[in-house]
């Protein structure tokens, strides 16, 4: 939980420094980094004071379990997130430019009067470059699993096996640790 708070706090400091009202994050890598959410559908909105996670009814329970410190908001569609942004007078919005489609950009510009956007891609990458304790522990665990899987594969591999068979073995072996 502390990790999520720390990550959000670092982004909030950046928002203040750059005079951005909020960051709107929806790509899976940055969404998971900021919220902890492992599902496939959700939007993170970080303002200078709050952090919210928007998702539809299918994922609200999962979000509640995986997104400590973020307010969970149930929505019907992406348009509900845009309505939230518009109703809270968020005019300077940070976006992950590389992940923002033309359709979404147009919807934001249409839905939020006088909206200014700024790319936050490089800042999120900078934040993610410095590993916290949770990430270090995950990397260590992944290395342990990889070492065990490689050792097991070395014992079972034989001439005539295809790459697909070896891959399937490794995938199945590693999934056993999750």
Regions from the PLM with identified roles:
Residues 26-28, 55-57, 76, 95-100:
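Structural motif
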Residues 33-34, 62-63, 103:
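Short helix/loop capping segments that flank catalytic or ligand/cofactor-binding pockets
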Residues 1-54, 79-90, 108-117, 151, ...:
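Terminal domain-start leader segments
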Residues 3, 79-178:
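Flexible, acidic/His-enriched mid-domain "rim/lid" segments that flank
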